[in-house]
Amino acid sequence: MSQTKNIIIFGGTGVIGKYITSAILASKESFDRVALFTSASTVSNKKEQLEEWKHQGLDIIVGDLTKDDDVLSAYRSFDTVVSAVGRNVIAEQINLIRLAEATPNITRFFPSEYGTDIEYNPQTSPHEKPHQLKLKVRKYIREEVRRLDVTYLVTGPYADLYLGNSNNAEYGSFDTKAKKATLLGSGEDPVSFTTMKDVGKLLVAALKHPEESKNKALKVNSFTATPNEILAEFEKQTGGQKWDVEYTSLAKLTELEKKAWEEGNPAATVYTLRRIWTEGGTLYKKRDNALIDAEETDSLAQAIAQVVDSQA
């Protein structure tokens, strides 16, 4: 299949989107054109960031992703669509995919996944509430897409967020100033993580390896660690003193999750995802980094060093 040369990004200024956009621009010599499709309000609200990217060679296309004419007009000059839209507009991708399938020059599409594997467990995954919109997107692709090559980049949780000082310690937290942590599960339950910087790096690697990533759900990561291993590294990097530690057991986490959904708590999704991770829903016998020549990734020590610095 032909190499990716012209990329259009949707959702490229969001939580993970900004890392993806930055990584693609850092490898711009590998591509002919990189553009960001965004709204007029984003152009106004994120002017400084967009100006910086424009100096790095990013083209800005202003439009409304809910308007077919805007999207079709934008698609005209590109061969690859990278979607990084947020959870609140995941379902809007179905229309982006439908229009891409109908646009002959578009040959590749990366839906917004970059997180927990929504098809990890055939028995339980279909029923997890946070997965529903992404599952609808995958269902549409399986049933309706015939021409496009589709690649899902499944990264597991973002290390940067999991390792942070949460405003709700019950679902896990690491506070470097107070030297206090709340660990999930037994402390010995391994979780596969990807730093947000590596999400961008791995996405670029997939873009550069079209044959290897063609029509695959790539299971990639930066590192795997248990909460106790994470704690030990935090203690090492903060002077060697033992931290105060509490635990939220898997049973307690499940109980808190149930209560959060019943009360309409916005944090319910976080409880569900962290329960899935603690149960082992990020673990594989083999990761796919080697398929796309992306074995060099951030380590646990590097990820924690960033957190320690950010909390200083």
Curated annotation (Swiss-Prot):
It is found in: Membrane. The lineage of its organism: Eukaryota, Fungi, Dikarya, Ascomycota, Pezizomycotina. The keyword Protein biosynthesis does not apply. It comes from Hormonema carpetanum. It comes from the Eukaryota. One of its GO terms (biological process) is terpenoid biosynthetic process. This is Reductase efuL. Reductase; part of the gene cluster that mediates the biosynthesis of enfumafungin, a glycosylated fernene-type triterpenoid with potent antifungal activity, mediated by its interaction with beta-1,3-glucan synthase and the fungal cell wall. The pathway begins with the terpene cyclase-glycosyl transferase fusion protein that most likely uses 2,3-oxidosqualene as substrate and catalyzes glycosylation immediately after cyclization. The fernene glycoside then could be processed by the desaturase efuI which catalyzes isomerization of a double bond established by efuA to form the core structure. Pathway: Secondary metabolite biosynthesis; terpenoid biosynthesis. Its EC number is 1.-.-.-. Coiled coil: none annotated.
